[in-house]
Amino acid sequence: MNAAERRTKITELLAASDRPMSATALAARCGVSRQIIVGDIALLRAGGMDIAATPRGYVLP
């Protein structure tokens, strides 16, 4: 899975979840490190996506 596919998958996972998802949980689902997910979330947010960070994880408001 390349970076663009991974970011799409992150968006889909967050949209489908009814609770916040941690970077660790997203990393396990995408087969990458937690730090890669943190970077991807930062890029998605910089691109205008409304992703909220909570103490329990990331969520789409």
Region spans (language model):
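HTH-adjacent hinge/linker in prokaryotic transcriptional regulators
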Residues: 42-61
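Key DNA-contact positions within bacterial/archaeal DNA-binding proteins
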Residues: 35
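Extreme N-terminal segment that seeds HTH/winged-HTH DNA-binding domains in transcriptional regulators
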Residues: 1-29
